[in-house]
């Protein structure tokens, strides 16, 4: 430490604290007020490292590529983490531990039990608490010298610029397409580097947008994908450690930029496959001269309706499709009455096998949606056999098939396929259960597992 000490020109026995917060404590209410475009956050003017700083950061201070000057840059940097979930938790944790000066934590959501396997800064005692406040509360116990600003709000075209322009670096840890476009366009307008990551199932991706002359998100994706092809963690699942790994690498990119080093993934996409244990770097195309966002930032349509543009909600919650008419759907209450009245029918569970293994209604048959979409002869033949058994057992000619899934999305798709396969047959009726098995658990059987 002698070499490091010789570089320190001054020392202070105290560490910086937030004036409105006690040490190692965060208030859950009230939340910080949003600052307008003309009410900029105060500049972080730290001129030297304190003795407590030297002790706390000593293991990274001795790194030649960082050193005292790099640590000072970190202490004067402000980072906004958008999304305090599976990615945002490791990002915020390592940024706080490394000594970032100010950390904005933005999330509209509250902590739920299904978050805890991957969102490791929350806990069972935080259920129902604002995620941004929960993260700030945990991190203040880790490093009270960092300024934490939790925002319990949804980012939208009306508030995005006034928030983002007050930070040096933006970490996009969101889980929906409209927010990614909104954050990208706002970063272009504000001239901020954007460190963006995603994680789904066993895979993760990471890249840096809008850094120097590098591309932005719209350069790569001028148009959003069809909403029905987009899968998030709630729909597709994710192994908890995958966002932990990608989020840690995301924090590393932020730290490099904040300390004055060049990021590794500007113009490069990192792809991680947890099943194979493999990392791959893919060079991505450069900045587009005709990009709608970064070719002329002053004309970027920051106030556009991003949900309409993407055809999906700016939320990581499961989307709700509306493919069927009301007459083609049954509420869980209506289906319960149908059961109680012993109306002959086939209940077809169209979820993937791993979900069926979690829970199922005992009288249902299982035909996965994928098998129907592919018109797999095995599954079509199986269904025809069950329909024949229904007619024989009930001494009826009416063929009623009711589809069910987790939330009532795939079941609607299944009805459309059934109508295509069997719709021309006499007395064939296909309907789905609105809200699926989770609505059944919510409104009919509280002991039915929720996932």
Curated annotation (Swiss-Prot):
Rhodanese domain location: 341-449
InterPro entries, sorted: MOCS3/Uba4, Rhodanese-like_dom, Rhodanese-like_dom_sf, ThiF/MoeB/HesA, ThiF_NAD_FAD-bd, Ubiquitin-activating_enz
Subcellular locations according to the entry: Cytoplasm, Cytosol
Gene Ontology CC: cytoplasm; cytosol
Pfam entry (one): ThiF
Assigned keywords, A-Z: ATP-binding, Cytoplasm, Disulfide bond, Metal-binding, Molybdenum cofactor biosynthesis, Multifunctional enzyme, Nucleotide-binding, Nucleotidyltransferase, Transferase, tRNA processing, Zinc
Enzyme Commission numbers on file: 2.7.7.80, 2.8.1.11
Pathway(s) it belongs to: tRNA modification; 5-methoxycarbonylmethyl-2-thiouridine-tRNA biosynthesis; Cofactor biosynthesis; molybdopterin biosynthesis
UniProt key word Zinc: yes
Keyword Cytoplasm (UniProt): yes
Name of the protein described by the UniProt record: Adenylyltransferase and sulfurtransferase MOCS3
Species of provenance: Xenopus laevis (African clawed frog)
Lineage of the species this protein comes from: Eukaryota, Metazoa, Chordata, Craniata, Vertebrata
């Amino acid at each position: 430490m002698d070499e490091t000490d010789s570089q320190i020109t001054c020392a202070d026995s105290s560490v910086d604290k937030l004036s409105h917060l006690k040490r190692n404590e965060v208030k859950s209410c009230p939340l910080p007020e949003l600052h307008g475009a003309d009410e900029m956050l105060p500049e972080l003017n730290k001129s030297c490292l304190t003795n407590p700083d030297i002790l706390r950061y000593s293991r990274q201070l001795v790194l030649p590529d960082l050193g005292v000057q790099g640590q000072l840059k970190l202490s004067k940097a402000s980072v906004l983490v958008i999304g305090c979930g599976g990615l945002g938790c490791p990002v915020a944790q390592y940024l706080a531990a490394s000594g970032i000066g100010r950390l904005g934590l933005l999330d509209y959501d509250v902590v739920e039990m299904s978050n805890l396997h991957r969102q490791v800064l929350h806990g069972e005692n935080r259920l129902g608490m604002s995620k941004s406040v929960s993260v700030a509360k945990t991190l203040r116990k880790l490093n009270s010298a960092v300024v934490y600003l939790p925002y319990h709000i949804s980012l939208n075209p009306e508030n995005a610029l006034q928030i983002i322009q007050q930070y040096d670096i933006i970490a996009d840890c969101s889980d929906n397409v409209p927010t990614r476009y909104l954050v990208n366009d706002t970063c272009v307008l504000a001239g901020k580097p954007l460190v963006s990551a995603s994680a789904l199932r066993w895979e993760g991706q990471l890249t840096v947008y809008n850094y120097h002359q590098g591309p932005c998100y719209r350069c790569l994706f001028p148009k959003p994908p069809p909403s029905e092809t987009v899968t998030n963690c709630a729909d597709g699942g994710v192994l908890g450690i995958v966002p932990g790994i990608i989020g840690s690498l995301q924090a590393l990119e932020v730290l490099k930029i904040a300390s004055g080093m060049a990021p590794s993934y500007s113009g490069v996409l990192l792809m991680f496959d947890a099943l194979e244990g493999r990392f791959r770097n893919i060079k991505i195309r450069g900045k587009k001269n005709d990009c709608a966002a970064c070719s002329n930032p002053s004309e970027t349509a920051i106030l556009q309706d991003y949900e309409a543009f993407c055809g999906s909600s700016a939320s990581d919650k499961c989307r709700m499709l509306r493919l069927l008419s009301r007459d083609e759907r049954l509420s869980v209450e209506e289906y319960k009455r149908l059961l109680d009245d012993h109306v002959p029918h086939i209940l077809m569970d169209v979820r993937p096998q791993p979900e069926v293994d979690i829970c199922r209604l005992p009288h249902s048959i299982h035909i996965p949606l994928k098998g129907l979409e592919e018109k797999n002869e095995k599954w079509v033949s199986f269904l025809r056999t069950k329909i024949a058994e229904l007619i024989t057992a009930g001494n009826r000619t009416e063929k009623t098939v009711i589809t069910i899934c987790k939330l009532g999305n795939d079941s609607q798709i299944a009805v459309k396929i059934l109508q295509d396969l069997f719709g021309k047959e006499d007395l064939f009726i296909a309907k789905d259960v609105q809200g699926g098995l989770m609505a059944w658990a919510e409104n009919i059987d509280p002991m039915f597992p929720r996932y």
